[in-house]
């Protein structure tokens, strides 16, 4: 059984899952829900108001961000939450599908890497036009997502 595991793929699955599980599910969904259910026990930075203050405050540092992005927060934040959860859901599907095994096609892992690239690109766009410091790590993660896509495609011989 252990000889059939594709050890070159498992770290990629673990990293993508851990990154998006923490940034999408734990930080956003659990933080916002905890802020609704028990506002006195929730960390204020992870509640809806906390995220709004942080994100809109970052966007408001630039005139472009203030004019174009800040008014859309209440509409865009739920979309961001869903987008940030998509890569880790696709990784779960990849693991359930057994894509960590050798000689196995990895479509769900590929979809997870593409969704990671898309989500990170959207986030980097908003942070870059706002001049936010968060854009630096996002640009690095865009690079990681692109390398992951190339690695998966190369590993499958495509």
Which sequence ranges carry the predicted segments?
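Membrane-interface interhelical connector segments
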Residues: 32-71
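Active-site-adjacent helix/loop patches that line small-molecule binding or acyl-intermediate pockets
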Residues: 85
């Amino acid at each position: 059984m252990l000889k059939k595991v594709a050890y070159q793929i498992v770290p990629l699955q673990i990293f993508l899952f851990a990154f998006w599980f923490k940034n999408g599910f734990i930080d956003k969904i659990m933080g916002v829900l905890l802020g609704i259910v028990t506002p006195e026990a929730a960390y204020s930075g992870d509640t809806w108001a906390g995220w709004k203050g942080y994100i809109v405050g970052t966007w408001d540092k630039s005139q472009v961000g203030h004019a174009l992005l800040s008014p859309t927060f209440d509409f865009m934040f739920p979309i961001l939450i869903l987008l940030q959860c998509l890569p880790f859901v696709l990784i779960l599907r990849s693991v359930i599908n057994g894509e960590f095994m050798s000689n196995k096609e990895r479509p769900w892992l590929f979809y997870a890497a593409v969704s990671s690239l898309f989500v990170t690109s959207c986030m980097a766009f908003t942070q870059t036009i706002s001049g936010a410091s968060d854009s630096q790590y996002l640009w690095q993660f865009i690079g990681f997502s692109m390398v992951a896509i190339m690695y998966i495609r190369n590993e499958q011989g495509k």
